[in-house]
Amino acid sequence: MPVTGKLEFDEEKRASWFSHKGEIATPSYYKVYLAEHDVVTEMTPTERAVLFRFTFPENEHSYIVVDAFDKGSYVKVIPEENKIIGYTTRNSGGVPKNFKNYFVTVSYTHLRAH
């Protein structure tokens, strides 16, 4: 989840208000403004993945919180490549027993782990 300001890991505390009136939702594109964090969030699907783009305000306190806190997850921060890689096995059902949801993030600014 894209957040700004004080880094917050609690889901309830980092939640953001948004308006359905400001959403754009089509089968090939989704866009929403997260008001609490002043972040524009966009996503578009591919055949087997989704691409996200977060547009943050210009400040020194912008983050992407990756929820990978259970025993079925793996996260690796590669600061020299501005990249985060990993996977989670969390799901809502309807997937094979060995399911893993892999992710790769690439930042065009510097990255660091917290």
Regions found by a protein language model. Give the residues of each.
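Generic recognition of long tandem-repeat/solenoid scaffolds
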Residues: 30-33, 41, 52, 83-89
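An exposed acidic His-Trp-rich patch
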Residues: 72-91
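Acidic, contiguous internal or C-terminal segments within carbohydrate-active enzymes
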Residues: 34-73
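Conserved small/polar residues in nucleotide/adenosyl-binding loops
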Residues: 109-114
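Broad, structure-driven detector of short, well-ordered beta-strand segments within folded domains
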Residues: 39-43, 75-77, 102-107
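Extended, loop-rich substrate-binding clefts of extracytoplasmic carbohydrate-active enzymes
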Residues: 8-45
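Catalytic and substrate-binding clefts that recognize carbohydrates or anionic sugar/phosphate headgroups
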Residues: 70, 84, 97-99, 103
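Solvent-exposed N-terminal domain segments of exported/luminal and surface proteins
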Residues: 1-3
